[in-house]
Amino acid sequence: MRATILGLLGLLGVLAACGDSTGTGSPGTLVVSLESPNTDDGAVAVSVTGTGLTSAAPVGSSVRVFWRLVSETEIQVIVFGNLTAGPLFSVNVGDVRHPDRYSGDVTQVAARSDALRDDISGYAIRLTRAESP
């Protein structure tokens, strides 16, 4: 009986060592940048999807960022300020080794005059790995 238990424990140890070779991921930060056809944007709403999302933060002090974690795979972010094309905010993600597994969509845009943009087809979001300090 004791030999059977020891054998099963040994087998469990071997099976545990044979896990996924990709590991558990490398948590970190991705920078979310805006591509905009306009120069007078005042607010943008963005949805970011991917695994292991936890939070968002502004990049720099010239914008205000509000976010809501919908699930572990979706975060909704609203950014206010005198927005220009380029980095807007960062998101903490489950695996920065694969930024291509994360995506973002612009869902609404307002001009600095507070008027909603009717056409947001020229807007896009780009996610890149944050530079190490």
Model-predicted segments: where are they?
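Acidic, low-complexity intrinsically disordered segments
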Residues: 19-133
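Sec-dependent bacterial lipoprotein signal peptides
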Residues: 1-18
